[in-house]
Amino acid sequence: MPILLEHIQLNDEDLKDTKHLAEILKYKNNSIKTIINVLEWEDSNIRYCYEKSNVYYFITFFIIVGLVWAIFPEVWLWCEQVFCISPTIHIIICCLYFIITIILFLFLCGVVGTFLHLWATFFTLSKCDSKILKLKEGLFTTLSLIWISTSLKTILKTKYAICRDYAKLTSAILHNLNIKHYFLVYPTHVAVAVKIDDYYYVIDQKLPIYKIDVWLKKLGKEKVKIYTPVDIYNSKLKFVEKYYKNENNLKSEISDDILRKIEEDVKKELQIKNAEQYNKKVEPIPVKLSIPIENYDEITHYSIVRVISKEIYNKFLTNIKNVSNIEIKKDEGKFAVNVYYEIPNSIPNSK
């Protein structure tokens, strides 16, 4: 679905619905950590709605194929009257028309199936006592969600979003916290960015914060249009510039001192103490990460620390207390972690 600037327009209700959340995510006297909190909250609480994203493609294709299917018989009858068409070609054309009919039916099934899937999901999640009320609430929520411009109230209620919803939510939170921000806009994608020391850092659905050049490389793009809100409601977006990827900002070198600094900060996050006393005979457990080395700088540092900490914690959960040490290293241009996990000597009796 093409991104229109109207899709990320805010209103009073959007700002009101996100004000409390913004206050919760605010980190005192540290705008960078506040932004990381916003991004981590979205990463942990909002799920990308592939159903909503796909349904627009289904509908678009359905309309195009449907128009072809509708006008084809008239065009074909006209061709038969004007031209001399052999029986073989007639059979081939009939077969093609039959295939188009099947494709049209399949895409119709896709649209209906996606709608019913979302309806059933929200029917199940509804807290209403009556089944009739559950059906009504599920239907209303589904229609609200798949609408082109979804309200933030619906996004926060359903915890489903696509890129423009993420951007709208991020913008509303940052507006409430008086943090100046920008929109990076493609025909099919939009993200939010902040400018620190004359350089753009991108907030795009998941941790970590990305340097704009690394973000462009990740998307396989060479340039992006940048806009800034003229007023608090994004009712007008002012074009700022067209940013072109700068290869000079894509360096995959990182010093051992920085790796040790990341290592120490991850240990603090996970409360790993006395790491120097770990058993070196323990075979490390490798944890691969998708964060490129070239994304590191002082601004992205803490967001990278949070990603690594979450990956390790999600792997070991409450057994994180048995992790005696970690080592951060480079692996094919990306960060990687060796986790030293020591199995306790005794297992508690389950009786």
Swiss-Prot record:
* Keyword Secreted in annotation: no
Q: Which residues cross the membrane?
A: 58-78, 91-111
A Pfam entry, by short name: DUF553
Keywords from the UniProt entry: Cell membrane, Membrane, Plasmid, Transmembrane, Transmembrane helix
**Cellular component, GO, one term:** plasma membrane
Where does it mainly reside? membrane
Among InterPro entries, the record links this protein to: Transglutaminase-like_domain
State the membrane topology.
Multi-pass membrane protein
Looking at the record's lineage, which domain of life comes first? Archaea
Q: Where in the cell is it found?
A: Cell membrane
Membership in a protein family: Belongs to the UPF0252 family.
The protein here is known as UPF0252 protein MJECL39
